[in-house]
Amino acid sequence: MGTARLRKLQLLLLLGAWRALGGAARCRVTLVLSPQKATSAVCRSSEATQDSELATLRMRLGRHEELLRALQRRAAEGGALADEVRALREHSLTLNTRLGQLRAQLQQEARAEPDLGAEPAAALGLLAERALDAEAEARRTTARLQQLDAQLREHAQLMSQHSSLLGRLQRACAGPERGQQQVLPLPLAPLVPLSLVGSASNTSRRLDQTPEHQREQSLRQQGPPSSLLPTGHLAVPTRPVGPWRDCAEAHGAGHWQSGVYDLRLGRRVVAVWCEQQQEGGGWTVIQRRQDGSVNFFTNWQHYKAGFGRPEGEYWLGLEPVHQVTSRGDHELLILLEDWGGRAARAHYDSFSLEPESDHYRLRLGQYHGDAGDSLSWHNDKPFSTVDRDRDSYSGNCALYHRGGWWYHACAHSNLNGVWYHGGHYRSRYQDGVYWAEFRGGAYSLKKAVMLTRLVRL
């Protein structure tokens, strides 16, 4: 606008000068105008071209809106996960506080009455069982918290990628492509705050640093297990058609993949883990320890019926094992692994349990293997729990060793003890998951599996 006025002023001055000279002489006036830069788009498109460009813009806008809706759905899912993480974190802290109170109460009562009678010992055993139940619940809650932590990180990463893609598309649409008009930026959905994800991880680390760290499970997600020790961290396939007589029958029918199978034991159908690849397959897993997620310090009825999940830590049950081993001659295989990754095996060429009327007494054959024989000392002994004491010791071995087993006076092995993290542990009693001939009684093993199958002729 200022440039136009300047030109007009120059023209008026020239006309005034010409008139002042009386118009006697004719002058030729040449105006030199500086070139001006265009400040707005110059449209040379025809109506058909404009319609085509408008259709292209609408198509791109539609794709933007579709991406935005997907991003908003992700944000909603992330918000729900964030709420669940907050609730689980609060629950974990509450469980941790309760667990500390139970431990303090247990230690106080143990110091107050060192020589326990039958009734106080049973009461103390129940108190210890409650403490271990609280520990197992805390471990499960923390594992769930870490799983949600991983999901939150994944969602945050995906949403960041979507936001970056939307930004690139917006910049491309806003560029000077054939005189197109600029597209207004789309509003982006807010990302899941990384501070929340970090706080979940910090909570998990705080649980690992509790004074009783030896009792806490490994909170890192287990990687794919070795073929030596079957575990439930792998995806469980659909169960083959059953129920089967035993895992060997399923293996003989062509089901060679390890997983959960249904076995018919008497009038019951029981879900078990069949190990179909270890040493020829056909093995029924009757016990597994791997992460401390299940409390094995429990009573007679639980040990009789079984507890845990076949794809994770579990005890098949004394009665189901009796039913399995009463169907012909069976062998027993025990697989062990320490915290350094060293594996060992113990094999017994015959194995069975007597019925409940004989307290599920253990019957073993000859030992073979490289783990050392730490179970034959328990041969011909009845099963004992904290509420059914049938060992040869004047006290209660199940109370001191924190788990049911075929105790003598008391034990050279106990694979049903407390799962301590890291191997060597400090405890008033020898109550870890141990095999005396393999790493000793003061070392709690990382993994232990007991398997049985029909003897193959």
Curated annotation (Swiss-Prot):
What does the entry state regarding organ or tissue expression? Highly expressed in the liver, specifically in hepatocytes, and weakly in the heart. Expressed in hematopoietic cells, platelets and mast cells, and detected at wounded skin.
Q: Where's the Fibrinogen C-terminal domain?
A: 238-456
Signal peptide (from-to): 1-24
Question: Which residues does the record list as glycosylated?
Answer: 202
Annotated region (Disordered) at 201-235
Please verify whether the record's keywords include S-adenosyl-L-methionine.
Answer: no
Q: Which GO terms describe its cellular component?
A: extracellular region; secretory granule
Entry-linked PROSITE patterns: FIBRINOGEN_C_1, FIBRINOGEN_C_2
Coiled-coil spans in chain:
51-77, 126-164
**What Pfam families would the database entry show?**
Fibrinogen_C (PF00147)
Q: Where is the composition biased (Polar residues)?
A: 219-229
Cite the entry's keywords alphabetically.
Angiogenesis, Coiled coil, Developmental protein, Differentiation, Disulfide bond, Glycoprotein, Secreted, Signal
Secreted among keywords: yes
Q: List the disulfide bonds.
A: 247-274, 397-410
Record InterPro entries: FIB_ANG-like, Fibrinogen-like_C, Fibrinogen_a/b/g_C_1, Fibrinogen_a/b/g_C_dom, Fibrinogen_CS
Its function, per the record, reads: May play a role in the wound healing process. May promote epidermal proliferation, remodeling and regeneration. May promote the chemotactic activity of endothelial cells and induce neovascularization. May counteract high-fat diet-induced obesity and related insulin resistance through increased energy expenditure.
What protein name does the entry list? Answer: Angiopoietin-related protein 6
In which organism is this protein found?
Mus musculus (Mouse)
